[in-house]
Amino acid sequence: MPGHRATAAKCKLAILLGLSWIIFSLVVPVGAEVVNFKELLPFVDIKIPGWTMEGKPSGTTLKQGNVMVSEARGSFKAGDQTLEVIIMDFLGKTIPFLTGQQLQMESSEETVRTTEVQGFKAVETFHSQDRQGELNISVADRFWVKLDGEGIDNLEVLKNVVQQMDLKKLATLAK
């Protein structure tokens, strides 16, 4: 089953990348501090035409030994469509697959490709059968901005939403 082997190989690669990212993220520069989640909240508290924010934006800052991370998130709804906007600070331990070469993969289930959003490296993924898409952006080699949409027909929804965000201003928080 060639398709099964290809899927298994992709899963193994994803696991390997994930594990290397976790190990890499545990090494924190001496004296470095994550941005407190309260500074990230305004970037997810956005007005999206046609969408309603569910509740209030929320966030967390965790510091335990050498592990430090901050995140802020906002959830939105428009009919049967849902959207989550997440910003994470891992002290520069951003998305590992964005540091390499250009990527483009298309199968009957999904499309994955590297791109640029507001001048920052990004990866977009769309699962057409599930009507689910993701846009992952590395901002200033410090922040991971993730837009996750469910019930969407294409990635244009996410691309339009990210235009409501001031990623260049977020980049100024990278000390």
What is the predicted role of each segment?
Residues M1-G18:
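Bacterial N-terminal signal peptides that target proteins for export
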Residues V34-S128, Q132:
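Short, solvent-exposed recognition patches
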Residues C11, S25, G149:
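Short glycine-centered, acidic/aromatic-flanked micro-motifs in structured strand/loop junctions
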Residues T7-A9, V28-G31:
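N-terminal non-cleavable signal-anchor helices
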Residues K77, T82, M105-K175:
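A short, solvent-exposed beta-edge/loop patch
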Residues W21, L40, L147:
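Generic anion/oxyanion-binding catalytic loop in active/binding sites
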Residues W21-P29:
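C-terminal segment of classical bacterial N-terminal signal peptides
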